[in-house]
């Protein structure tokens, strides 16, 4: 018992990753499919998690629970498959995920969750998604900070061009950046980073909707896009970019990034990790 207590106390210090025996690195050849899995929605305001598909997001034909290890179960994760299509080192620009006609009630569901500061959590290759920020409080010493997940949306304000005060805006376009590492000691590439940069775009197009072949007029332009307001029922087009970046970080060190997560998230992340360490003693 004394040993367990000492380990627990040591583990509640800000830490991020944990390693479960039997979890081995996966090597992906160029062009091979990489699964992007959706997880829960969480908020530090409510502490009440929701399943990802509790909101009217794009869904695959068959939604399946795909939790892979005990750690995910202990964290209360609700991991499911997704409709996103990614291939190792194959980049995408403004790829259409789906188009949905949302009712006033569905728009309000999104808006309420945004008001409650809900964040979306995804998983790729057993890594949770993260959003990167640069803290420039001290201009001469900028600090990179990561937050787990990414914001579902934001509330409009006078400081945000093209928005109305108090109206909710949905982050329907996502830049997915995956960092990979290669080495002579193995074939293919290993995933060592998974970042999301969300944005809100009211997409437009000419002519009839042609599913994935539709040419969106709101992609690739130099002019600022209009954010997608949730103030009335209507069309929502979900899109995403995929970017691949080589990294010197090795697979065994890929969790080090999560040492830079924000203070509020460090607290809960550390407690859960500590409990798992004690259980595995």
Map each language-model feature to its residues:
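Hydrophobic cores of alpha-helical transmembrane segments in multi-pass integral membrane proteins
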Residues: 6, 272-281
